[in-house]
Amino acid sequence: MTPSSLELTVLGAGPAYTNRLGSTGAAYLVRGGQTAILLDLGQGAFTNLAAGIEPSTLTAVAISHLHPDHFVDLVPLRHYLRYEFQPPRRVAVIGPAGLASRLDALHDQPGFAAVSLDVTDHQPGPVTIGSLSLEAIRVQHTTDSYAIRVAAGQGPGLVYSGDCGRADDLRPLIRPGDTLLAEATYGTDPVAPGSNHLNAHDVGRVAAETGAGRVLLTHVLMGRDRGKAVSAAAALVRVPVDVVDPGDHFDL
């Protein structure tokens, strides 16, 4: 790995519910040099995290929004750091306002998260995390949802949509050549009114218009044809398009 390169390992790529065996909630491990940033940690994804790396070596976890399929496995991460090490080890977590109190409420225990997670809110503009930069901007989904860009130096980065109901919200983050990891919840189907999600056509269009260098589709609902979703996005953009699964690895 060169100083300006990134690696992406998919630990989870599922939506809130699915019948696909082995599917887990959103979790994407981005590494550059000695820095490891985890984007989201949804239901069931901690197992894949722990099978792949020592979780306590994470430089940071960045959470896109406060829906359980994107953050709930912070609970097993907290437990692991608390009970497998004496004294407990700590990991930085960046997320929407209220994340720590949401975790505390799950256990009806004030200070539950703070035992081993250093939780802070997303801030405007790029921030430096180890050797990487991270920038989060608000997108339409919940009242406090974020898309996130991770980059190493001036090279192409990774833009993660989180859950997003308006593809144009991603434009400020995407630089020419970036990899766009974007939800295509509805596959090729029309997006249900008020759902605040995207389909493959939305993703392909914004990727083409912003000069993305690669498209990775994720978060596709059960019953939607994933192959057709890839074809629909690929028809709109002249770059590689794939749909991701746990265990997939990409050199960006």
PLM features: residue spans?
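Active-site metal-binding motif and surrounding structural segment of the metallo-beta-lactamase
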Residues: 44-92, 178
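Active-site neighborhood of phospho(di)ester-bond hydrolases with catalytic His/Asp-centered motifs
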Residues: 38-42, 59-69, 96, 158-162, ...
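Short, solvent-exposed loop/turn segments at secondary-structure boundaries
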Residues: 20-21, 115, 191-196
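Short helix-capping segments at alpha-helix termini
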Residues: 83-87, 110-114, 235-240
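Conserved beta-strand hairpin/beta-sheet module of binuclear metal-dependent hydrolase folds
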Residues: 1-56, 145-162, 179
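Cap/insert and terminal regions of metallo-dependent hydrolase folds
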Residues: 167-251
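Metallo-beta-lactamase
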Residues: 90-145, 152
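Metal-dependent catalytic neighborhoods of phosphoester/phosphodiester hydrolases
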Residues: 73-81, 106, 225-233
